[in-house]
Amino acid sequence: MNTCFLVLDYHVLNGRAEQTALIYDSPVTGKKKSYTYKQLTNEVARTAGMLAEMGVVKGDRVIIYMPMIPEAVMAMLACARLGAVHSVVFGGFAANELAIRIEDAEPKVIMAASCGIEVKKIIPYLPMVNKAIKDSRWKPEKVVVYQREECPAELNSNPGVDGRDVDWSQQLAKSNPHDCVPVDACDPLYVLYTSGTTGKPKGVVREHGGHAVAMKYSMSVIYNAKPGEVYWAASDVGWVVGHSYIVYAPLIHGCTTILYEGKPVRTPDPAAFWRVCQEHDVNILFSAPTAFRAIKKEDPEGELIKQYPMPALRTIFMAGERLDPPTLQWVEEKTKRPVVDHWWQTETGWAISGNPLGLEEFPLKPGSSTMPTPGFDVQVLDETGSPVAANEQGFIVIQLPLPPGCLATVWRNHDRFQSGYLTQFPGYYVSGDGGYIDEDGYLFVMGRIDDVINVAGHRLSTGEMEEILGGHNDVAECAVIGAHDALKGQIPYGFVVLKDGHYSVDGNIEKELLQKVREEIGAVASFRNVMIVNRLPKTRSGKVLRR
């Protein structure tokens, strides 16, 4: 088998060659472009040929550090075509986070863009790639750079890297198309790093076969999507939603997918989502609750929604963080469309629970992600591993075996896979979330039970932030907690105790700490609050009390 064949070649051979596969819509650059299945297949085949000519073969790792542009999708699918293992790193991560992933994945090649483009801001990528490689013990053989006209990068400008950097477009022009390489169903398709409780990100390994089955099944059962329809997951390819529901699932299912380089607001206004839905005849929209809270904040009466009838839009799905009932009710009231909450994780790759519209639609219960998806035996246990009664909170677990598509292991660290997910309650996968199941079988997910917080749908480790704060010369002790935020769901809040005789003058230490977290994790952490305190609250055993 080959996942790229299922995504592209299969449809070209079975009557969808001229159907639009990918729509690129970039309000930050003003560019739009569409690719048919045939056109996208040709581009991916040539990109695979380019990688093959650099020596990339089945099993090699390729890190992709790119913004939301078509070439990012082409890079992912080109790796799949060759049987190489891609590891996409979110473009908002700083050089330190990229370096950690380079060292763990050991890529033969890094594929990057010259820059990312945010609202009124351009972020050069190559300087971060250069720093990450410098800081990592592993050195890739090549760095392929896609030059964006908004900010071209100077290649091979760093000492000692002569010939390492390759111009993407120039190399592609000389490359020949490459056929799909057969792989086994259990071969790794990709490694995607997610925040772990130890601070060090863990590489979730996804296999070709089970992943393809889960993607196809979920499009029918969860989203009730039909081949040929337009599916838009307003996320980023650097996250699991982007992997599963921008790239793989819609295309495996024969849908048209949208790649949106913009924001829910400020590109140019809170009508951005509605404009895309109207213009591209979107049938199914999927995003995080944070996006809709941002829209609600700037257009509380929903006046801009009225300007876009969106006749094709059938259903709005939300996931990535807890969907608060007021946001759900506001979106349903203003859009006149049903909102479906569903819950899943980077580790599973698809919905653990949701409303299976393609099988049977269940009545809505605000605050609940409805029922466990077929294949997931979801239970709630107490600290001893015993099942709890209905409506009683506990640890949300999944009885083994896990269904197709879930993580097979942690990259090069199977012991961490076992200890992190399978040891606490033998026979069960531990989700890391707490919640309860009511008397009707509805699942309510209430939040994390470890040190991972959810900032605007992005999983981040407070432990990793504490390591950074604790590394400051003036800091004796520190703690980071997740605080409620009306827009982002949670934001990190830091508390530090200074060493005796050390003092902050005009907030200099606080500023240094904020900058240090931004440099090492990135702006995605939204770390903007740190307070110097005399002491931290402790439990009787001497552990920092976080509540």
Task: Cite the ranges covered by each PLM segment.
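Conserved ATP/PPi-binding loop(s) of AMP-dependent carboxylate-activating enzymes
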Residues: 371-375, 386-421, 460
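Conserved pre-ATP/AMP-binding loop-to-beta segment of ANL
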Residues: 18-20, 143-151, 156-193, 200, ...
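Structural core segment of the AMP-binding/adenylate-forming
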Residues: 77, 81-170, 288-289
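Conserved AMP-binding/adenylation subdomain of ANL enzymes
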Residues: 212-230, 240-284, 297-303
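Conserved beta-loop-beta connector loops within the AMP-binding
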Residues: 379-400, 439-440, 503-510, 545
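Gly/Ser/Thr-rich phosphate-binding loop
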Residues: 255, 283-287, 296-363, 377, ...
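AMP-binding/adenylate-forming catalytic domain of the ANL superfamily
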Residues: 142-145, 487-490, 519-544
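AMP-binding/adenylate-forming catalytic core of the ANL superfamily
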Residues: 89-115, 129, 278, 285, ...
